[in-house]
Amino acid sequence: MGLLTPIQLPRLDELGAVHFIAIGGSGMNGIASMMLAHGIPVSGSDRQDSKYLRSLEAQGARVYVGHRADQLGDASTVVASSAIREDNPELAEARRRGLRVLHRSAALGSLMLGRRGIAVAGTHGKTTTTAMIAHVLSGCGLDPSFVIGGALTGTATGGHLGSGDIVVVEADESDGSFLQYPREVAVVTNIDPDHLSNWGSADNYADGFLRFATADSVRLLVTSADDPGAVVLTERIRQRAAAGLPVPEIMTFGTSRDADVRIVGADLAGTGSRFELRWDDDAGPV
């Protein structure tokens, strides 16, 4: 399941019936839900029953508890994450039959094709930030599609197929697969060395975020002016710009006086907060 560039990602109409291994997982059920909304036949299995399996079944998916080779049915494409071992009976059967096997991030990338992608990465806060962006865009009447690594409050899914041309996704950096998402806007909440067993070193981990933020498709980077790792990322990109290399526009946020969008007077109480946002010569309460 090697990484694919956006130009290599299969189109949805090329996938046929899709089977998800570990379909109830936080990174999988939203993708499966969006594929169902596109009219793609979906099946999948997980080690144990859950509200996510029941929700997907109600949406039209065939779901199974436990992994068995015969559950692939007529699938043409099998989706798995990095956590699925090669000796998984369903993955082994897919290999034996020569089926297309996609990493979950490639399946998500295919869902993003033809839409304006906003990909949210960072060591901490990805799920919350992705949900907030999707909520704000929905409130503006843009009806974005979204895939989030967790269920929205009051639902059993993290995926939604909207009528608008924007798609907002949570971009998991743990295995480097966030680099293959087609994206116009890259959001980096913070950078704190993590998943070093996959990346090898803190420097490699930081370099991954640099590649994420400076891909040819990225027109805008939104990142923190407070987080030390994000500040270093911004500095590295500005150095690239000074050297004449193409870089995205950068918009920073935070409490720092250097932030393009500044948070002032934050009052945190219970599960809510109030603060003022200041940008350019404008300001407004939130």
Task: Pin down the residues of each PLM region.
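Short linear motifs in intrinsically disordered
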Residues: 45-46, 150-156, 259-269
